[in-house]
Structure formats: structure tokens, C-alpha cells
């Protein structure tokens, strides 16, 4: 059974899901695929994990570099391929962007076979644990801010928060925006 709660952030309300031990989902309210893979859920704000999730989110929005390791995560849904893609996303260092091609190459190395950027993009779009599995750090080869289930406006805001220079919905490579 999944346990759910709502948490306010500077970019809107998020819905968090847990199996009681780990964070299994984090979606901006109303985003595409909200609460995907959640079945038999109960709302409970008293789960001890929520304190750590809330603190990690506060730290993140105050500019702390890497908060993802502060909270255990688990992928409870998805295909083996999707889980492989999501696991690779956790390897993207803070203040860094990778392209869909970069992610596809890394997933291909792990799976021992070629993987297309398009297939990777589809899996990234279904990422159930926003922010902690940083899919917002993946951009097109041109630097364009393509796709984000929480909305491109949020993707832009998250990348700027992390210090990237974003002009006309494109990350400017090699340029950092000082916050």
C-alpha cells in the first residue's frame, strides 16, 4: 500500500508517495502521469520519511547542491528498461546537464546494447520521482528544454536554480548563471 502526502514548494504543490520506507513517487500536482504506479493509496502526513523529504526539498530550493542522497528511493513500477533509464538519471551530477543522447549511451553501456534517444526520452517522461531522479537535467543535443512532465516552465526554473544560463528555452553550454 502506498502512502501519500502533499508538500508545498516554490514551484507548486508536489504529491509524494512512499512504500513506508522509501520515496516511490514525487509529482507536481496536475502534471502528466501524476501518481503513476500508485495503487491502494492512503493519505498520511505522519510518515517519518516525510520529514526528510520536506527537508531535502527545502534544502534544494535554497540552493543546496545534492539533496537526492538524503532520501532513500525505490522504483515500484515501470518496465526493466524504464528502471534502467531512471537509474542512470540518478548518476547525473548536480549543476550538470546531459543530453538524451548521453543518457541513451549510458543506458546502452549498462544494458549491453544500443539504445535510441527517443526510447530514452519516452522513459524519462514517465520518471515517477521528480527532482530526486533529476530528469529535468536532460536536454536536447542543441540545449533545448524539450519535454518535462511538470512543464517546461518548471524545467527552466529548476535549471536556473541549479545555476544554468537558460536563454529562449535553451541551456547555454559552458555558461553558468550565478544565483
Residue ranges and their predicted role:
Residues 130-149:
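Charged low-complexity interaction tracts in eukaryotic proteins
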Residues 150-166:
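A short, Lys/Arg-enriched interface patch at domain edges and termini
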Residues 108-122:
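Short, positively charged loop/turn segments that connect secondary-structure elements
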Residues 1-111, 161-179:
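Basic nucleic-acid-binding alpha-helical/helix-turn surface characteristic of O6-alkylguanine DNA
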Residues 81-85, 116, 154:
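N-terminal positioning helix adjacent to the helix-turn-helix/winged-helix DNA-binding module
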Residues 123-125, 132:
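Major-groove DNA-recognition helix of helix-turn-helix-type DNA-binding domains
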Amino acid at each position: 500500500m502506498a502512502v501519500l502526502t502533499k508538500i508545498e514548494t516554490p514551484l507548486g504543490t508536489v504529491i509524494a508517495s512512499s512504500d513506508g520506507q522509501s520515496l516511490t513517487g514525487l509529482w507536481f500536482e496536475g502534471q502528466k502521469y501524476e501518481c503513476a504506479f500508485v495503487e491502494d493509496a492512503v493519505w498520511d502526513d505522519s510518515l517519518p520519511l516525510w520529514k526528510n523529504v520536506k527537508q531535502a526539498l527545502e534544502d534544494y530550493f535554497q540552493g543546496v547542491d545534492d539533496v537526492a542522497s538524503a532520501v532513500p528511493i525505490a522504483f515500484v513500477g515501470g518496465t526493466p528498461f524504464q528502471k534502467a533509464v531512471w537509474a542512470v538519471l540518478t548518476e547525473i551530477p548536480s549543476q550538470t546537464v546531459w543530453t538524451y543522447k548521453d543518457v541513451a549511451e549510458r543506458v546502452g553501456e549498462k544494458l549491453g546494447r544500443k539504445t535510441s534517444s527517443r526510447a530514452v526520452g519516452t522513459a524519462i517522461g514517465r520518471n515517477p520521482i521528480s527532482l530526486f531522479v533529476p530528469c529535468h537535467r536532460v536536454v536536447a543535443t542543441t540545449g533545448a528544454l524539450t519535454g518535462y512532465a511538470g512543464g517546461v516552465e518548471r524545467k527552466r526554473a529548476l535549471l536556473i536554480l541549479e545555476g544554468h544560463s537558460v536563454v529562449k528555452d535553451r541551456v547555454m553550454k559552458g555558461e553558468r548563471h550565478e544565483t
